[in-house]
Regions:
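Helix-to-loop junctions at the C-terminal end of transmembrane segments
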Residues: 24-38, 230-243, 328-329
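Conserved MFS/SLC helix-loop-helix module at the cytosolic interface between two early adjacent transmembrane helices
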Residues: 24-62
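Cytoplasmic helix-loop-helix junction between adjacent transmembrane helices
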Residues: 67-102
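Intracellular juxtamembrane helix-capping segments at the cytosolic ends
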Residues: 76-90, 282-298
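Helix-loop-helix hairpin linking two adjacent transmembrane segments in secondary transporters
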Residues: 98-149
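Extracytoplasmic gate region of multi-pass secondary transporters
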Residues: 176-229
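C-terminal transmembrane helical hairpin of 12-TM major facilitator-type secondary transporters
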Residues: 241-288
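A late C-terminal transmembrane helix in Major Facilitator Superfamily
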Residues: 298-333, 340
Length: 369
């Protein structure tokens, strides 16, 4: 891509900045829109299809940047709308499986594009094929947009967000600023840990702990596999035990895994720590989304709160890995593990604070066939 544009590798970083900024703006705005999930998902998917078509025909980096902004706007709307819908309707199992599907797509997508490129297709055509797939999905969502109807209880919850009834103290209640900020910071730190461990795990294991390149590559792939498996397996566990118990164990497991990565010893110990970290982190963000009514003190403001959490997670997943990269460049690769340990402990403290101030609420509606 950079060769066809005649640009250095560093110039492609501009695309990342544009895409994340657009996604954050879109996520925040989505929480304030009165439209329902179906139209939002349909419009967002169509916008990503248009964005991929623009990118497929891009003659320069700046046209590619326009496509990236459009894609970020569409993706942010989809992400916030789906998570908001899940917070109002799903149980612990379903929301974890939804996020597991994100991970599966993120794993399969690059492999498919790599296969297309290896088969002789240019990246322009690969993007064009992805645009067609997204357009087909958009048509499916447009046709089925009425299938996202809110249940009567969820409609009452949604209406309460925008029009609290006079005399109803619970409907007027808003989360204290400190609790809201805690929730957003927690989301940013947690997703930053996930991305940071996955982004820099290979460098840490090879340069920092001296493992062979092949072993480190398998370990990092296994880390992402643990994220996927953890959401598939721990979702039903959280459904049975309650969504509050699993995150409490997970926020303990994340610093425990980072501590094993930090501890002196054979490289295998660091690999085990990375696996534990991945497994522990897997269900945290999905269950945070599910527990938003508790952190928000009731149904009021759930959709807006979730949209802000999605925006915070996008910022954290970009900013913290970048900061960890600067730390690795300034010190050495081994600094990753203690940095993750400190972040994990900070995340645990945020969770304890937020949980102390959260209020129990009725569980979300789980649709039945």
């Amino acid at each position: 891509m950079r060769l066809s544009f005649g640009e250095p590798v560093g110039a492609l970083g501009i695309l990342l900045v544009f895409g994340i900024t657009a996604s954050v703006i879109s996520s925040v705005a989505t929480g304030r829109l009165p439209v329902r999930t179906g139209p939002l998902v349909a419009v967002g998917t169509m916008l990503t299809a248009v964005a991929l078509a623009v990118e497929a025909s891009a003659p320069s980096l700046w046209v590619m940047a326009i496509g990236t902004v459009l894609f970020g706007l569409g993706f942010g709307a989809i992400d916030a709308a789906l998570n908001g819908h899940a917070a109002r309707h799903f149980g612990a199992r379903d929301i974890n499986w939804m996020h597991a599907s994100y991970g599966l797509g993120a794993t399969i997508g690059p492999l498919l594009v790599a296969a297309l490129l290896s088969g002789g297709l240019s990246w322009h055509r690969a993007y064009g094929l992805m645009a067609l797939v997204q357009a087909a999905l958009a048509i499916v969502f447009i046709v089925g947009r009425r299938g996202w109807r809110e249940s009567p209880r969820a409609n009452a919850s949604r209406a309460g967000e925008d029009k609290p009834r006079p005399g109803d103290g619970r409907a007027r209640r808003r989360p204290p600023a400190a609790v809201a900020l805690t929730s957003l910071t927690f989301a940013a730190v947690e997703t930053g840990i996930e991305s940071g461990a996955g982004t820099w795990g290979y460098v840490f294991l090879t340069v920092g702990r001296g493992l062979p390149a092949g072993t480190a590559g398998v370990a990092v792939s296994a880390y992402w596999a643990m994220m996927f498996a953890g959401r598939v397996v721990l979702g039903p566990v959280a459904e049975r035990l309650g969504p509050a118990r699993v995150p409490a164990a997970a926020v303990t497991g994340i610093p425990a895994g980072a501590a094993l990565m930090t501890a002196p010893g054979p490289g295998l110990l660091a690999v085990i720590g990375l696996m534990i970290l991945g497994l522990a982190a897997a269900p945290v963000f999905p269950l945070l989304t599910l527990m938003t009514p508790q952190w928000a003190g009731g149904s009021t403001g759930v959709t807006r709160m979730v949209s802000l959490q999605v925006a915070a997670s996008a910022i954290g997943s970009a900013a913290l890995p970048a900061g960890l990269g600067l730390a690795i460049g300034a010190v050495n690769a081994r600094i990753l593990a203690p940095s993750l340990l400190v972040l994990g402990l900070a995340m645990g403290s945020l969770y304890v604070f937020g949980s102390r101030w959260s209020r129990p609420t009725t569980p979300p509606v789980t649709p039945r066939a």
